């Protein structure tokens, strides 16, 4: 009798588990691909093209009107859609175009819409706005956005990066509307958003549905064949975007092999690499713990940092940990924090100003910057009450980064929600520093 009851109980539990699994899959699918209304936004920007995407409540043929001074050209879809995509190609590099989008079932905000194609001008002044873990639609997020707008003082952003966790808590279509599209409407009119996936984004499948990234090297760099990791160039900066959440993080995995090929071919003066999980942190996550984030921080540190430093990457940006942490110009620290030795791992000990040879030299020093602080609504308290020894600069208040690249100098500013610049550092490159 007891055996029979146990069998029946087990069968019921299996049935309920299967039912839950099916229901859960249904929720994930619904949240990931739910049809929502969405204003036009820019994607997959290159020197010669850009993609425009938007979503309407009814099926219709969308059109984009565009031109350098007037809206003299038109590109339309061939079949009615709800999810719209139009690629504008045959454009001129480093050129600003006006554009507007026509839709019948959705009121489009076409005020002040323009974009600028990517440039290969090594002398251009480039301003890069970096947001990390910005997907909470809250007062902090809005204050961080407003503080950067005031700090820019009317200057335009050339490149826009997000470090993952772009829509809390689960990266659904509706959460992306709230945490991204409703939060940054003006920037979305003018700039393609280059983003990496975070752990919260990966709870649903909307990320790779919303975003479209270059896979064939069309924006610069070596073709990756995958939107999970890719590269693009703007001015004299080579950007590399990696998926530390869902992709194989092994040293012999496809992402690592592609990274080596891409960096070996890179001829740009500056290289910035972006991935979500920081190799060094004592913020809201602990990079010493293999149990934290299922070892992703450890794996990125052990398997990817040797590649980045071998090819003389200048700056590595990460989020995930809700704070601001920064290293000095450093190298070769691939172990846990208790193995840190300043005499071995710090290349230059100045707190703010760094010098590098204009030629790429292996292991000449990299700055690691955690900036997952764009919507966390922090109280200024370090949850671990200790700094990571590799990261002597650390603050636990919300803000975002402005990176300004002018020829052979890169300056990074951490602008917090009240407008104060809490940290500023620079790297200068010259033949005079080649010793």
Q: What is each model feature region?
A:
Residues 2-135, 146-155, 271, 361, ...:
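Acidic, histidine-bearing metal-coordination/catalytic regions of metal-dependent phosphoesterases
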Residues 123, 136, 140, 152-155, ...:
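Extracytoplasmic/periplasmic, Sec-exported soluble proteins
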Residues 130-132, 159-165, 192-199, 242-243, ...:
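Active-site neighborhood of phospho(di)ester-bond hydrolases with catalytic His/Asp-centered motifs
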Residues 75-76, 98-116, 173-271, 285-299, ...:
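Extended active-site neighborhood of metal-dependent phosphoesterases/phosphodiesterases
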Residues 125-196, 201:
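Conserved, compact domain cores that house catalytic/ligand-binding motifs in diverse enzymes
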Residues 134-137, 166-170, 199-203, 236-237, ...:
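Solvent-exposed loop/turn segments at secondary-structure junctions
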Residues 63, 206, 325-326:
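Phosphate- and divalent-cation-binding pockets in alpha/beta enzyme and binding domains
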